[in-house]
Amino acid sequence: MRIVFDIGGSVLVPDDPDIDFIKAIAYELTKISEDHEVAVVVGGGKVARKYIKAAKTFTPNETFKDYIGIHITRANAMLLIAALGEKAYPFVVQDFRKAWEVIQLKKIPIMGGTHPGHTTDAVAALLAEYLQADLLIVVTNVDGVYDSDPRKNPNAKKLDRITVDQLVDIAMEGESKAGGSGVVDALAAKFIQRGKIRTYIVGKKDAYSLFDVIKGKHSGTVVEP
Protein backbone atom coordinates (compact mmCIF):
# COMPACT_ATOMS: atom_id res chain seq x y z
CA MET A 1 0.00 0.00 0.00
CA ARG A 2 0.90 3.64 -0.36
CA ILE A 3 0.09 5.46 2.89
CA VAL A 4 0.20 9.12 3.91
CA PHE A 5 0.43 9.90 7.62
CA ASP A 6 -0.75 13.27 8.93
CA ILE A 7 0.82 13.74 12.38
CA GLY A 8 -0.64 16.60 14.41
CA GLY A 9 1.87 19.00 15.91
CA SER A 10 0.15 18.95 19.30
CA VAL A 11 0.60 15.18 19.37
CA LEU A 12 4.29 15.38 18.54
CA VAL A 13 5.05 18.49 20.63
CA PRO A 14 2.29 19.02 23.24
CA ASP A 15 4.26 21.66 25.16
CA ASP A 16 7.74 20.27 24.76
CA PRO A 17 8.76 17.53 22.30
CA ASP A 18 7.35 14.17 23.44
CA ILE A 19 10.55 12.18 23.04
CA ASP A 20 9.05 8.79 23.89
CA PHE A 21 6.21 9.27 21.42
CA ILE A 22 8.56 10.49 18.69
CA LYS A 23 10.75 7.42 19.20
CA ALA A 24 7.68 5.18 19.08
CA ILE A 25 6.24 6.54 15.85
CA ALA A 26 9.68 6.62 14.22
CA TYR A 27 9.96 2.91 14.99
CA GLU A 28 6.44 2.23 13.68
CA LEU A 29 6.97 4.24 10.49
CA THR A 30 10.26 2.46 9.84
CA LYS A 31 8.60 -0.93 10.29
CA ILE A 32 5.68 -0.01 8.03
CA SER A 33 8.01 1.33 5.32
CA GLU A 34 9.58 -2.11 4.94
CA ASP A 35 6.46 -3.34 3.13
CA HIS A 36 4.64 -0.14 2.15
CA GLU A 37 5.37 3.25 0.59
CA VAL A 38 5.14 5.92 3.28
CA ALA A 39 4.95 9.72 3.30
CA VAL A 40 4.44 11.95 6.34
CA VAL A 41 3.09 15.46 6.92
CA VAL A 42 3.73 17.07 10.32
CA GLY A 43 1.64 19.86 11.85
CA GLY A 44 2.52 22.87 13.97
CA GLY A 45 0.12 22.28 16.84
CA LYS A 46 0.10 24.25 20.06
CA VAL A 47 3.51 25.80 19.45
CA ALA A 48 2.38 27.25 16.12
CA ARG A 49 -0.81 28.58 17.68
CA LYS A 50 1.21 30.29 20.43
CA TYR A 51 3.37 32.04 17.85
CA ILE A 52 0.35 33.01 15.76
CA LYS A 53 -1.40 34.40 18.84
CA ALA A 54 1.68 36.43 19.72
CA ALA A 55 1.91 37.75 16.16
CA LYS A 56 -1.65 39.09 16.38
CA THR A 57 -0.26 41.71 18.76
CA PHE A 58 1.84 43.09 15.93
CA THR A 59 -0.04 42.41 12.70
CA PRO A 60 -3.58 41.59 11.48
CA ASN A 61 -2.10 39.96 8.36
CA GLU A 62 -3.44 36.38 8.24
CA THR A 63 -1.06 35.34 5.44
CA PHE A 64 1.95 36.54 7.41
CA LYS A 65 0.74 34.53 10.41
CA ASP A 66 0.25 31.49 8.18
CA TYR A 67 3.93 31.73 7.22
CA ILE A 68 4.86 31.69 10.91
CA GLY A 69 2.86 28.49 11.31
CA ILE A 70 4.53 26.95 8.26
CA HIS A 71 7.99 27.55 9.75
CA ILE A 72 6.93 25.83 12.99
CA THR A 73 5.58 22.80 11.11
CA ARG A 74 8.90 22.44 9.34
CA ALA A 75 10.80 22.59 12.62
CA ASN A 76 8.59 19.77 13.91
CA ALA A 77 9.18 17.87 10.67
CA MET A 78 12.95 18.16 11.16
CA LEU A 79 12.57 16.64 14.60
CA LEU A 80 10.88 13.57 13.10
CA ILE A 81 13.54 13.40 10.38
CA ALA A 82 16.18 13.28 13.10
CA ALA A 83 14.32 10.44 14.85
CA LEU A 84 13.95 8.42 11.63
CA GLY A 85 17.62 8.73 10.78
CA GLU A 86 18.71 7.20 7.47
CA LYS A 87 15.19 5.98 6.69
CA ALA A 88 13.99 9.56 6.11
CA TYR A 89 15.00 11.98 3.38
CA PRO A 90 17.37 14.35 5.25
CA PHE A 91 15.56 17.60 4.41
CA VAL A 92 11.98 18.78 4.81
CA VAL A 93 10.23 18.14 1.49
CA GLN A 94 8.31 21.20 0.28
CA ASP A 95 6.42 19.99 -2.80
CA PHE A 96 4.53 16.90 -3.88
CA ARG A 97 6.67 16.01 -6.90
CA LYS A 98 9.73 15.90 -4.66
CA ALA A 99 7.83 13.67 -2.22
CA TRP A 100 7.16 11.25 -5.09
CA GLU A 101 10.84 11.29 -6.10
CA VAL A 102 11.90 10.57 -2.51
CA ILE A 103 9.53 7.59 -2.31
CA GLN A 104 11.18 6.18 -5.45
CA LEU A 105 14.49 6.37 -3.57
CA LYS A 106 12.96 4.10 -0.88
CA LYS A 107 13.12 6.93 1.64
CA ILE A 108 10.32 8.51 3.70
CA PRO A 109 9.53 12.10 2.66
CA ILE A 110 8.61 14.33 5.61
CA MET A 111 6.66 17.51 4.90
CA GLY A 112 5.34 20.40 6.95
CA GLY A 113 3.19 23.25 5.72
CA THR A 114 3.48 24.45 2.13
CA HIS A 115 1.26 27.43 1.33
CA PRO A 116 -0.58 30.10 3.35
CA GLY A 117 -4.24 29.24 3.78
CA HIS A 118 -3.57 25.49 3.75
CA THR A 119 -3.36 23.64 7.06
CA THR A 120 -1.13 20.58 7.25
CA ASP A 121 -4.31 18.47 7.21
CA ALA A 122 -5.05 19.99 3.80
CA VAL A 123 -1.45 19.38 2.70
CA ALA A 124 -1.71 15.73 3.76
CA ALA A 125 -5.01 15.27 1.91
CA LEU A 126 -3.59 16.87 -1.24
CA LEU A 127 -0.44 14.76 -0.97
CA ALA A 128 -2.54 11.61 -0.61
CA GLU A 129 -4.52 12.63 -3.70
CA TYR A 130 -1.37 13.44 -5.69
CA LEU A 131 0.32 10.17 -4.75
CA GLN A 132 -2.93 8.24 -5.31
CA ALA A 133 -2.46 6.83 -1.82
CA ASP A 134 -4.47 3.85 -0.68
CA LEU A 135 -4.87 5.28 2.81
CA LEU A 136 -4.60 8.55 4.73
CA ILE A 137 -4.06 8.27 8.48
CA VAL A 138 -4.67 11.41 10.54
CA VAL A 139 -3.16 11.34 14.04
CA THR A 140 -4.67 14.03 16.24
CA ASN A 141 -5.08 14.93 19.91
CA VAL A 142 -8.73 13.81 19.76
CA ASP A 143 -9.38 10.08 19.41
CA GLY A 144 -11.62 10.32 16.35
CA VAL A 145 -14.43 12.39 14.86
CA TYR A 146 -17.27 13.50 17.15
CA ASP A 147 -20.69 14.93 16.36
CA SER A 148 -19.57 18.10 18.19
CA ASP A 149 -16.34 19.33 19.78
CA PRO A 150 -15.68 17.01 22.79
CA ARG A 151 -13.43 19.66 24.31
CA LYS A 152 -16.44 21.95 24.59
CA ASN A 153 -19.34 19.48 24.83
CA PRO A 154 -18.98 16.67 27.42
CA ASN A 155 -21.91 14.87 25.78
CA ALA A 156 -20.31 14.75 22.34
CA LYS A 157 -20.60 11.33 20.70
CA LYS A 158 -17.70 9.69 18.87
CA LEU A 159 -18.52 8.42 15.39
CA ASP A 160 -16.84 5.09 14.58
CA ARG A 161 -17.63 5.17 10.87
CA ILE A 162 -18.77 8.07 8.68
CA THR A 163 -18.95 9.00 5.02
CA VAL A 164 -16.70 11.66 3.60
CA ASP A 165 -19.79 13.83 3.04
CA GLN A 166 -20.48 13.68 6.78
CA LEU A 167 -16.85 14.63 7.46
CA VAL A 168 -17.23 17.71 5.26
CA ASP A 169 -20.42 18.74 7.08
CA ILE A 170 -18.78 18.37 10.50
CA ALA A 171 -15.59 20.14 9.41
CA MET A 172 -17.52 23.08 7.95
CA GLU A 173 -18.47 24.02 11.50
CA GLY A 174 -14.82 24.64 12.40
CA GLU A 175 -12.89 27.84 11.89
CA SER A 176 -10.58 28.54 8.97
CA LYS A 177 -8.36 31.30 10.40
CA ALA A 178 -4.65 30.77 11.01
CA GLY A 179 -4.15 28.44 13.96
CA GLY A 180 -7.56 26.79 13.78
CA SER A 181 -7.59 23.56 15.79
CA GLY A 182 -10.44 21.38 14.54
CA VAL A 183 -9.86 17.61 14.16
CA VAL A 184 -9.86 18.03 10.37
CA ASP A 185 -10.47 21.41 8.78
CA ALA A 186 -13.05 22.02 6.06
CA LEU A 187 -10.55 22.42 3.22
CA ALA A 188 -8.82 19.14 4.11
CA ALA A 189 -12.19 17.39 4.31
CA LYS A 190 -13.11 18.67 0.85
CA PHE A 191 -9.80 17.43 -0.57
CA ILE A 192 -10.43 14.01 1.01
CA GLN A 193 -13.88 14.07 -0.58
CA ARG A 194 -12.54 15.08 -3.99
CA GLY A 195 -9.77 12.50 -3.93
CA LYS A 196 -12.05 9.72 -2.66
CA ILE A 197 -9.40 8.88 -0.09
CA ARG A 198 -10.03 6.20 2.53
CA THR A 199 -9.10 7.85 5.82
CA TYR A 200 -8.58 6.78 9.43
CA ILE A 201 -8.67 9.50 12.09
CA VAL A 202 -7.05 8.27 15.31
CA GLY A 203 -5.76 9.58 18.62
CA LYS A 204 -2.31 9.52 20.16
CA LYS A 205 -2.90 6.25 22.00
CA ASP A 206 -3.56 4.40 18.75
CA ALA A 207 -0.55 6.05 17.12
CA TYR A 208 1.81 4.08 19.35
CA SER A 209 0.74 1.08 17.22
CA LEU A 210 0.55 2.52 13.71
CA PHE A 211 1.40 -0.92 12.33
CA ASP A 212 -1.97 -2.10 13.69
CA VAL A 213 -3.76 1.07 12.60
CA ILE A 214 -2.98 0.48 8.92
CA LYS A 215 -4.69 -2.90 9.28
CA GLY A 216 -7.83 -1.20 10.61
CA LYS A 217 -7.15 -2.11 14.24
CA HIS A 218 -7.84 1.14 16.08
CA SER A 219 -10.45 2.95 18.18
CA GLY A 220 -10.73 6.02 15.97
CA THR A 221 -13.01 6.94 13.07
CA VAL A 222 -13.09 5.37 9.61
CA VAL A 223 -14.01 7.81 6.84
CA GLU A 224 -15.42 6.00 3.83
CA PRO A 225 -14.88 7.72 0.45
Curated annotation (Swiss-Prot):
Q: Which residues are listed for UMP binding in this entry?
A: 44, 66, 114-120
| Biological processes, Gene Ontology terms | 'de novo' CTP biosynthetic process; UDP biosynthetic process
Q: Which ranges form a coiled coil? A: none
Query: What Pfam families does the entry give?
Result: AA_kinase
Identify the EC number(s): 2.7.4.22
According to the UniProt record, which cysteines are disulfide-bonded?
Answer: none
Subcellular location per the Swiss-Prot or TrEMBL entry: Cytoplasm
Q: Which gene encodes it?
A: pyrH
Q: How does it assemble?
A: Homohexamer.
Listed A to Z, the keywords are: ATP-binding, Cytoplasm, Kinase, Nucleotide-binding, Pyrimidine biosynthesis, Transferase
So, what pathway does this thing act in? Answer: Pyrimidine metabolism; CTP biosynthesis via de novo pathway; UDP from UMP (UMPK route): step 1/1
Residues that bind ATP: 9-10, 45, 49, 140-141, 146, 149
Q: Which organism is it from?
A: Thermococcus onnurineus (strain NA1)
Know the name of this protein? Uridylate kinase
Task: Please describe what this protein does.
Answer: Catalyzes the reversible phosphorylation of UMP to UDP.
Q: What SUPFAM superfamilies does the record point to?
A: Carbamate kinase-like
Citing just one GO molecular function, the answer is: ATP binding
Record's family?
Answer: Belongs to the UMP kinase family.
Catalysed transformations (reactions) = UMP + ATP = UDP + ADP
